[in-house]
Amino acid sequence: MKGMVISMTQKQKEIIADNLRAYENNFGYIKIVKEDYGKGFYVFTSEERAEQGSWTQYCYNIDYLNGWLYGCVQAANGIMKKIDREE
């Protein structure tokens, strides 16, 4: 794993495994930290941001995190296209 996942249950790791692997293959570094109180996760997308404590994304639960990882990969690969508005 290029990044790291901190304080996550085995079931949670299994939920995000495919999208996490795809994210790492497209972007490289990721660090996911479970919040102290609650069900959320902080996502850091570079070592510098992690060292500074400057998270990139807050995901309020494991399903949101899984969807966020999926969306990043879809956007990186041009799967989602912007609306072409004609004027």
For each predicted feature, which ranges?
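Negatively charged, low-complexity tracts enriched in Asp/Glu with abundant Ser/Thr
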Residues: K2-G28, I79-I83
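Acidic, low-complexity, intrinsically disordered interaction modules
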Residues: Y23-I79
